[in-house]
Amino acid sequence: MRKKQVGAIAIKSFALLVVLGTAYQAMAQDATTPYPNMAPIEQYLMDRNAEIAMARSAAPESISRDAEIRVLGRHGYETAVKGKNDFVCMVERSWISPIDDPGFWNPKGRAPICFNAAAARTYLPRVIKKTELILAGRTKAQIIETIASAVEKRELPAMEPAAMCYMLSKQGYLSDSAGHWHPHLMFFVSQSEPTARGAGLPGSPIFAFNDTWEHLTTFLVPVREWSDGTEDR
């Protein structure tokens, strides 16, 4: 259970902190982390074809083969393959972790993820925006302030019903402690009470992350199989 809890924290897509002020505390802690600063951009980039293949591994082939694929460039994510089924697959980097996570700047982080249409319209813009800010050299405090303001002003949309994603890749490296963790699904909801769905209760298989200031709740459900059909062991 402890391993799952640690891993769940490591893979939460785009979790910031509950209040803006904690960003400054996080920056003060950076000096004690294994990755106190952003590495050279080259360490986060991948071979284009390898990144496309890794992105597709996030979901079963029946979904990912016709999905739009985005890859990371020097200024943000770029469309590498146009899709036919409204899904969007990509490989997130370590800065999608909580902003005070010790591995926030870990250049080894690779999180293959595939969003359905609802998540692509409403959750993906947050990932894109945060990545652009990071690659433009913004500080953690500036990133939090910009994203929080955009959410409050509705420049970044609220979650649509049914917004979710697949994270079923064996190829992922979510953190130094979790590795590829376990195959799982995530569901994005605009501010919900986690316990209303039983998340976090004793014996419940559902994890939840509640970001009050971001007006976002993420539910995480581990599943038994990887995208290639093999069983998680």
Segments and roles (model prediction):
Residues 30-233:
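Primary mode marks residue(s) on the alpha4-beta5-alpha5 output face of response regulator receiver
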Residues 2-14:
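Bacterial N-terminal signal peptides that target proteins for export
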Residues 16-20:
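Hydrophobic alpha-helical membrane-embedded or membrane-associated segments
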